[in-house]
């Protein structure tokens, strides 16, 4: 089953932010967590079971000594920073941030594939291949050949 890993991670990020999984650090001081009201997000989230599975895959980034990629996943998907903002903060090119995020997303997608587990969100994040029509493809080929 092919999944859109970015949609999976967006849902996981919402779940992780709302449930504070502790994969990064707690935004609330010890002992004060129950005193603040929960702020549910309007973004789509994943189930607790899916969240724990994805959490384990994300935490594997730290196990294989890739803490920078883990921090990018946390910054982008959990905290909601844009790729440009992350690049500015780290004083690096945005293309480098994009490349490292792609590597981290691929790693997490690979972990999920190795587990061969079916997620509750699979029907919503399934990658659909576009229907191929011979006429359209041949028309594109003709235009491409004419350009050359």
UniProtKB/Swiss-Prot annotation:
The keyword DNA-binding applies. GO terms for biological process: transcription antitermination. It comes from Acyrthosiphon pisum secondary endosymbiont phage 1. Positively regulates expression of some phage genes. Bacterial host RNA polymerase modified by antitermination proteins transcribes through termination sites that otherwise prevent expression of the regulated genes. InterPro entries: Phage_933W_GpQ. It comes from the Viruses. One of its GO terms (molecular function) is DNA binding. It holds the Pfam family Phage_antitermQ. The gene is 5. Belongs to the phage antitermination Q type 1 family. Keywords: DNA-binding, Transcription, Transcription antitermination, Transcription regulation. This is Probable antitermination protein Q.
């Amino acid at each position: 089953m092919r999944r859109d890993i970015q949609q999976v991670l967006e849902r996981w990020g919402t779940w992780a932010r709302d449930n504070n999984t502790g994969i990064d650090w707690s935004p609330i001081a010890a002992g004060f967590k129950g005193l603040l009201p929960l702020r549910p997000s309007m973004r789509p989230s994943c189930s607790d079971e899916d969240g724990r599975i994805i959490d384990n895959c994300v935490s594997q980034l730290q196990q294989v000594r890739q803490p920078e990629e883990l921090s990018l996943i946390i910054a982008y998907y959990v905290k909601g920073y844009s790729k440009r903002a992350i690049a500015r903060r780290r004083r690096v090119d945005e293309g480098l941030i994009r490349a490292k995020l792609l590597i981290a997303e691929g790693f997490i997608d690979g972990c999920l594939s190795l587990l061969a587990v079916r997620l509750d969100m699979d029907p919503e994040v399934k990658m659909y291949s576009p229907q191929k029509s011979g006429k359209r493809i041949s028309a594109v080929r003709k235009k491409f050949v004419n350009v050359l």
